[in-house]
From Swiss-Prot:
It comes from Beijerinckia indica subsp. indica (strain ATCC 9039 / DSM 1715 / NCIMB 8712). GO terms for molecular function: ATP binding; metal ion binding; protein folding chaperone; protein-folding chaperone binding; unfolded protein binding. This is Co-chaperonin GroES. One of its GO terms (cellular component) is cytoplasm. HAMAP family: CH10. Keywords: Chaperone, Cytoplasm. Its main location: cytoplasm. The gene is groES. Together with the chaperonin GroEL, plays an essential role in assisting protein folding. The GroEL-GroES system forms a nano-cage that allows encapsulation of the non-native substrate proteins and provides a physical environment optimized to promote and accelerate protein folding. GroES binds to the apical surface of the GroEL ring, thereby capping the opening of the GroEL channel.
């Protein structure tokens, strides 16, 4: 199935969380927090201003981003756990 987000929404795949701490302690699945970093899979065309002019998004597919803990809506597409969120939920692009 293909999915194309509308307006100023983006589809994000979470990056895998760390299995170990820097000190070498293994973190069990039950203690892991969901990562707040992901990769953009797809972007919508953008939002519109008051005059109806299309405003393109600042992010593109392939960008690695940071987002808030409670950002987005979790969905499952083709067996992949993904997030759909507005561009305004994105905190920044990781360079």
């Amino acid at each position: 199935m293909t999915f194309r987000p509308l307006h100023d929404r983006v589809v994000v795949k979470r990056l895998e969380s760390e299995e170990k701490t820097k000190g070498g302690i293994i973190i069990p699945d039950s203690a892991k927090e969901k990562p707040q970093e992901g990769e953009i899979i797809a972007v919508g065309p953008g939002g519109r201003d008051e005059s109806g002019k299309l405003i393109p998004l600042d992010v593109k597919a392939g960008d690695k981003i940071l987002f808030g803990k409670w950002s987005g809506t979790e969905v499952k597409i083709d067996g992949q756990d993904l997030l759909i969120m507005k561009e305004s939920d994105i905190l920044g692009v990781v360079g």
